[in-house]
Amino acid sequence: MKALRWYGRKDVRYEDAPEPFPEAGQIKARIEYAGICGTDLREYASGPCMISPTKAPITLGHEFSGRVVQLGKGVKDFKIGDRVTGLGYWACGECYFCKRMQYNICLNQGFSGLTENGCMAEYMVAPHYAFYNLPGSVSYEYAALVEPLAVGLHAVRKSEMRPGDTVAIVGDGTIGLSVLLMALAAGAASVYIVSKHPGRAGIARKMGADAAIDPGKEDPVKQVQLLTGGLGADVTFECVGNPDTAQMAVDIARRDGIAVMIGVFDRAGPFHFADVVFGEKRIVGSSIYVREAEPVIALLADRRIDPGLLITSRVPLQEAVELGFEKLLKDKENNLKVLLKIPKKEDC
């Protein structure tokens, strides 16, 4: 089969790879679309980060849609031909956290496209519990967005946001805009986004943001205070993964407010806790998702959310490096979520 495989930094190849076979409890899916995530981009541009060099070559990708083509022994909750999407991680089911159904912080996690072969290929295999059935009303394109949308929903749930709350989001990537969609679906009264890319800020406004604040032109903390009568936001979300934007998210939150950290941080930084202490602010971590895939699929099926503006281009898998990874690195202004269309055998 054809696959997009990571060999090292700036070395990702479209090539032939062994076609996987499902073991007991696994499902084999024919992939329709795979999304390029910020994690994939980081591994391409500056990896290995989460990928072990000993795993190379490894097929990238954890955001996907497709259909079931083969069932491993013992799988009874799916059938051949089912349209599916799925999780990007696998849990052990045995550790302290798994026994408490906190699978997202499993001590022995495996990650599609990082520790195991992923979805940027004609076929992939994964444990049956990593798949979800799709209703006919959800397209393959939108289904490939379920994973990042689930990250957004999990963060909103962790924030304990209530209908009528004011929300501020620091970061204008796919996760930041997924949080925007989910906060609005959960009843946020106002949502402000801190965005340094005018193109992405425009997308955020079209998706429902009440204001987009450019940190290069104005102070986001002061601007949110102006917009909230001097209080600050009830809930803030950090979706960048930078110590400076983490501090910003805390500073934007009102007293007794909540700042949720979603971004993937690759370095430590100084942090001033005085405002947290005297303002009784709460800082909460949010890691991927647990039971959010099914609610996201329901929201898509009922058309209560429309993530179409997240998709800025669709490119063939064989052109993923130049038209996907490189474009995302060189032109963040006009590129957000790139979907890779997986070729059929006759196209290879």
Regions found by a protein language model. Name each.
Residues E19-A34, P48-Y96, P135-S137:
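Glycine-rich beta-strand-centered segment in the early N-terminal region that forms part
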Residues V138-K217, K222:
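Mid-domain Rossmann-like dinucleotide-binding core that forms the NAD(H)/NADP(H) cofactor-binding site
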Residues C92-V170:
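NAD(P)H dinucleotide-binding glycine-rich loop of Rossmann-like/cofactor-binding domains
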Residues G81, G164, A209, G232-A233, ...:
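Local beta-strand N-terminus motif with an aromatic residue
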Residues S159, G202-R282, P343-C348:
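Glycine-rich cofactor phosphate-binding loops and adjacent beta1-alpha1 units
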Residues S195, G263, S287:
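Conserved acidic E/D residue at the C-terminus of a beta-strand in Rossmann-like folds
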Residues M1, Q247-D251, V290, E294-C348:
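C-terminal hydrophobic helical "lid"/dimerization subdomain
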